[in-house]
């Protein structure tokens, strides 16, 4: 599992640890909670679905929107491209996360970096508000989901191993 961490150290999380479809994705101080942890699931062709550890749901585009300002929320797995993301390395070692359907990047509404800032998609802009640090979470020390069987990350797929440098920052 990974944290999707902003340059200021805050992370993307599921708002109020809500398990329902449509729950918002926002920025918040990292506290080790499983609703702040994400698994990158290989979707083929260099694409990833981003699954929340706590809810098991995926980062998705609200209402399937593709315009600037479309909010991010969580939703159960679909076959649509609104849940598919590509990772792009930046010169400073961070990662941009681009939605395949919308061809836009994970961003924060109003470039707000305080607790509660809503995640959205936006066209490429030069700046830190679209750059993320993907930080691996140690499964033995992080808080875990209530599911007792979930103790370790599963073995990576060949595609995940190939792109592992993209995921570890």
Feature locations, PLM:
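Low-complexity, intrinsically disordered Gly/Pro/Thr-rich segments
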Residues: 117-121
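Extracellular glycan-recognition/adhesion modules and their associated mucin-like linkers
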Residues: 1-19, 34-66, 84-113, 131-149, ...
């Amino acid at each position: 599992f990974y944290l999707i961490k902003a340059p200021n150290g805050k992370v993307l999380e599921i708002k109020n640890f809500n398990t329902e479809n449509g729950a918002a994705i926002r920025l918040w101080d990292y506290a080790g909670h499983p609703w702040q942890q994400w698994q990158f699931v290989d979707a083929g062709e260099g694409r990833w679905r981003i699954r929340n550890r706590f809810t098991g749901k995926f980062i998705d585009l609200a209402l399937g929107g593709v315009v600037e300002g479309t909010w991010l929320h969580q939703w159960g797995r679909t076959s649509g491209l609104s849940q598919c993301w590509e990772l792009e390395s930046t010169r400073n070692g961070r990662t941009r996360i681009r939605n395949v359907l919308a061809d836009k990047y994970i961003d924060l509404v109003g470039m707000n970096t305080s607790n509660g800032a809503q995640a959205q998609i936006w066209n490429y802009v030069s700046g830190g508000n679209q750059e993320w640090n993907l930080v691996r979470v140690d499964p033995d020390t992080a808080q875990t989901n209530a599911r007792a069987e979930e103790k370790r990350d599963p073995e990576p797929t060949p595609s995940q191993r190939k792109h592992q440098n993209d995921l570890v920052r």
